[in-house]
Design a protein with these regions (language model features):
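N-terminal, membrane-interfacial amphipathic/helix-forming hydrophobic leader that caps
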Residues: 1-95, 238-306
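Membrane-interface helix/loop boundary segments of multi-pass membrane proteins
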Residues: 13-20, 154-179, 183, 190, ...
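Residue-level recognition of membrane-helix boundary sites in multi-pass small-molecule transporters
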Residues: 104, 175, 225-226, 276
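Juxtamembrane helix-loop-helix connectors linking adjacent transmembrane helices
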Residues: 4-13, 25, 46-69, 88-158, ...
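Aromatic-anchored segments of alpha-helical transmembrane domains
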Residues: 39-46, 116-122, 181-191, 232-241
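Residue-level signature of the transmembrane alpha-helical core
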Residues: 109, 113-114, 145, 149, ...
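Juxtamembrane helix-entry segments on the extracytoplasmic side of multipass membrane proteins
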Residues: 133-145, 193-206, 274, 278
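Functionally important transmembrane alpha-helices
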Residues: 201-266
Length: 306
């Protein structure tokens, strides 16, 4: 056999070495940007809570109620300011994803409430959930609603505006959607730590689908407030019905309705609540498919960085 004859063992790799190095560089650059952006957001919140908030309390002495309002409003404002500063100084662009779009925001909120209200209504109709008592609204409900809104906005700021965008720029839309959805689900393991394997599997499935839902909505709208409104409305609607919200039992005491679940876990969602119900998972998956198809038709999908 001549030296220049074909030898399978000498077949070059599927990807040239230069492309591999380029992908490694892109990934490292993405990780560096992610670290910097995370530090900008979390650092701003830390400075506010440890420095500015105690100063406000000392100088103005607003009292516990108003100090709580300042804390909640301040956390959102400084987190967004930190993100804006990161985008402005590091990415050197306008943070268009922070622009308010009132009509789209309202539609996002209504859509989030309707999307989870439908399977919950079906669960009540099937007898899987039972209404025990109508308590009416309590003053504490407003405070919990504010916490839900803050948590939803912060989660979307970190997971969609920062994490997803940077993943998308490095690896493309499809891979970024999948990775951020899984990373969104993993922190929720703590909420079902006292449950069984079935609760854990159902939670991972349901929250991964939710990560795809809000990731897909961000791909379609490229707007923080639309996605945050959808997320917050989803959570608040669950709270109103008196069933567990993402495995959190504490807030059920302030819900206008007192409810209990009486069906099998695959139908009720078990300890995690209706988000892990098969009905909610299926209906949300259908909406995810529709969102991603609409986003693709708009040309909102991007390939990995070269």
């Amino acid at each position: 056999m001549s030296s220049d004859s074909f030898d399978p063992s000498r077949t070059p790799p599927a990807e040239p070495e230069g492309i591999v190095r380029q992908r490694i560089r892109v990934t490292l650059r993405m990780l560096g940007s992610l670290l910097l952006g995370g530090m900008a957001i979390m650092g701003s919140v830390l400075v506010f809570r440890q420095g500015l908030l105690p100063l406000i309390d000392t100088v103005f002495q607003p009292g516990p109620a108003w100090l709580s309002v300042c804390r909640r409003a301040g956390i959102i404002l400084v987190a967004i300011a930190g993100y804006w500063a990161y985008v402005h100084w590091h990415e050197k662009r306008k943070a268009t994803e922070l622009q308010l779009q009132p009509v789209a925001l309202i539609l996002g909120g209504v859509g989030g409430a309707a999307l989870v209200a439908l399977p919950i209504a079906m669960l009540f109709a099937f007898g899987a959930y039972e209404l025990v008592l109508f308590r009416g609204a309590s003053p504490a409900l407003l405070g919990v609603a504010a916490l839900i809104g803050i948590a939803a906005t912060l989660e979307e700021l970190v997971h969609r505006c920062l994490l997803f965008r940077l993943l998308e720029r490095a690896w493309g839309t499809v891979v970024a959607l999948a990775v951020q959805a899984v990373l969104f689900a993993l922190p929720h393991l703590e909420n079902v730590a006292h449950g069984g394997p079935g609760d854990i599997v159902a939670m991972l499935m349901s929250v991964t689908v939710l990560g795809l839902l809000w990731g897909g909505l961000f791909v379609l709208t490229r707007n923080l407030w639309v996605v945050a409104a959808n997320h917050a409305a989803w959570n608040f609607t669950i709270l109103l019905t008196g069933v567990p919200l993402s495995g959190i039992e504490d807030w059920r005491a302030v819900a206008p309705l007192e409810s209990r679940y009486a069906g099998p876990d695959w139908l009720t969602g078990g300890i995690f609540g209706p988000e892990s119900s098969l009905l909610a998972i299926v209906s949300t998956t259908v909406v995810v498919v529709l969102l991603l198809r609409a986003a693709r038709r708009r040309g909102a999908f991007f390939k990995a960085a070269a």
